[in-house]
């Protein structure tokens, strides 16, 4: 076994089946507590996938560190600061970027949306940078809206790939629709 090819999928395949958009020959991103990046072939088969811990990191760092007073996850991330956080992380790394989130609040008096944008830009840097490196030209993004929209924005800003954002209702209903699809296959 090799660490770089070992991974687990526990339910995301059901969510994938329930999406109401064409996912053939695409990367499908399902941001959530465990964000999945799934490669789907031209004949609709899962051929590869990667898991990222961005959702849990976002929650843990924003709730259980000195950033808990700075990062409000109920805010809307400021797009300008998403880019600033992303670019800062590219130059200085995740640890310094996270601490600078606090500095922005303390010294520069950024508002909640700006602080949250910088924070999310930094946290998403590694995941976005990895996704951009894949050869697929088409990326479909569903999943939890709190991570979906910053992910879509940064992908559109920093890649030349076609980005399709699944609407919230379809993304939210995808697990149920996937179960119904599986049931219809098994029941036939």
Label the predicted regions.
Residues 46-52, 158-168:
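Short hydrophobic/aromatic-enriched beta-strand-loop microsegments
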Residues 132-138, 161:
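Short, surface-exposed connector motifs at secondary-structure boundaries
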Residues 87-130:
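Adenine-nucleotide phosphate-binding core of ATP-dependent small-molecule kinases
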Residues 30-36, 144-149:
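Gly/Ser/Thr-rich loops at beta-strand to alpha-helix junctions
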Residues 137-154, 172:
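Glycine-rich phosphate-binding loops at beta-strand->alpha-helix junctions
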Residues 2-28, 36-92:
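Glycine-rich phosphate-binding loop plus the immediately following alpha-helix
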Residues 165-188:
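Glycine-rich phosphate-binding/hydrolytic loop that grips phosphoryl groups
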């Amino acid at each position: 076994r090799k660490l770089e090819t070992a991974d687990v999928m526990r339910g995301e395949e059901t969510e994938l089946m329930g999406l109401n958009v064409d996912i053939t020959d695409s990367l499908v991103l399902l941001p959530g507590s465990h964000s999945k990046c799934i490669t789907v072939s031209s004949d609709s088969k899962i051929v590869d996938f990667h898991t990222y811990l961005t959702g849990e990191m976002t929650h843990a760092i924003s709730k259980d560190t000195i950033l808990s007073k700075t990062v409000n996850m109920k805010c809307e991330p400021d797009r300008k600061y998403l880019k600033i956080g992303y670019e800062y992380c590219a130059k200085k790394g995740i640890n310094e970027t996270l601490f600078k989130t606090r500095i922005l609040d303390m010294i520069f008096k950024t508002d909640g949306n700006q602080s949250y944008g910088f924070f999310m830009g930094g946290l998403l840097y590694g995941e976005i940078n990895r996704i951009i490196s894949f050869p697929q030209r088409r990326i479909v993004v569903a999943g939890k809206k709190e991570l979906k929209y910053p992910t879509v924005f940064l992908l559109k800003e920093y890649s030349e790939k076609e980005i399709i954002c699944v609407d919230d209702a379809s993304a939210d209903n995808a697990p149920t629709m996937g179960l119904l699809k599986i049931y219809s296959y098994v029941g036939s």
